[in-house]
Swiss-Prot record:
InterPro entries, alphabetized: LOG, LOG_fam
Catalytic activity entry: N(6)-(dimethylallyl)adenosine 5'-phosphate + H2O = N(6)-dimethylallyladenine + D-ribose 5-phosphate; 9-ribosyl-trans-zeatin 5'-phosphate + H2O = trans-zeatin + D-ribose 5-phosphate
GN (gene name): LOGL6
NCBIfam families: Rossman fold protein, TIGR00730 family (TIGR00730)
Residues the entry annotates as binding substrate: 98, 116-117, 133-139
UniProt tissue specificity: Expressed in roots, leaves, stems, tiller buds, shoot apex, immature inflorescences and flowers.
Keywords linked to the UniProt accession: Cytokinin biosynthesis, Hydrolase
GO CC annotation: cytosol; nucleus
EC number: 3.2.2.n1
Protein name according to UniProt: Probable cytokinin riboside 5'-monophosphate phosphoribohydrolase LOGL6
Amino acid sequence: MMDTDHTEIIKEGEAVVEAMALLQSRFRRICVFCGSSQGKKKSYQDAAVELGKELVARNIDLVYGGGSVGLMGLVSQAVYNGGRHVIGVIPKTLMPREITGETVGEVKAVADMHQRKAEMARQSDAFIALPGGYGTLEELLEVIAWAQLGIHDKPVGLLNVDGYYNSLLSFIDKAVEEEFISPSARHIIVLAPTPKELLEKLEAYSPRHDKVVPKMQWEMEKMSYCKSCEIPGLKEGNKATIQAQRGSML
């Protein structure tokens, strides 16, 4: 009887430790790239909802592309329903196409795709890509390239649902083999088949790749650029606004 009680106490203690670990995530916000379509398989849709719930369980807010359709709509709704903050960033031109019905959370309208990606990156502590098309792939590869260049050191996660990204991974391995991508840069991508496993890996992530340029050098260059591009005669208020817009994306 005492052995049984002791076992139960240990199990309860382990559950408390696990719950505390979830509450103490290193991330405040994670940016999720995903399709504006739901995809052919139900597993893609299930993964989007599951990812949203996993973010909620870890008290992490969502940054995403702002749409209410496709996988974007599913993951944002799951996070919002769980009581976490949602920030959607979307170009005004895409609003009629990617927003239908009621939106959730905070919607930031921007002028174009470049501003969208910069704002999403600026707001986030890490990145995750769900299945998606050209847009998702472009967003994913850009943050990978930025990490390789040393612009940021934020984790980049790939949720490889049902092997969706196997062909992309084969291409990257081929590029490493042909010496277009360095072996160390292959470690930029954090890979997992489920949201829970991916979040656990992202929490433990530490950069292992060789950066082309140190991050500090990028930041110093940016500060120098902001100062050199001041417009003579510009009012202080407007000058501060422009400099803020040129400020750190990441």
